[in-house]
């Protein structure tokens, strides 16, 4: 049984203006609401929907920065939560030509001591789940080393 998934999605740091937020609402069954606390909340049917929505927002940021001749800078996470987002970004790269050539990425953590090629390394996780599938330049990838 699928349960609705909700989470706070912020436009802070995405570079999306009001016009962009209107144009990129994502799947039609997404419900968007601003509570009394003014925290923008999005409720979707399942994790695949939220992964697509987040990936669409990241893609819009990348495309907008590319159009302005700027570099898109992404802070990325590891673990099971972002895997669906990374899969959708890979699909957008392969099927729709989303380019990561002008993207710089940062991850915040790594185990210590941990060699980058260790099966538990966040460095390895990012290369296996995103970087090796898109055209990001290796020199633009910043994952702390634990060795």
Question: What does each model-identified segment do?
Answer:
Residues 43-44, 74, 111-116:
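A short glycine/serine-rich beta->alpha loop
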Residues 55-63, 90, 94, 127-131:
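Generic structural signal for well-ordered alpha-helical scaffold segments
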Residues 63-95:
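Glycine-rich N-terminal segment of FAD-binding domains in flavoprotein oxidoreductases
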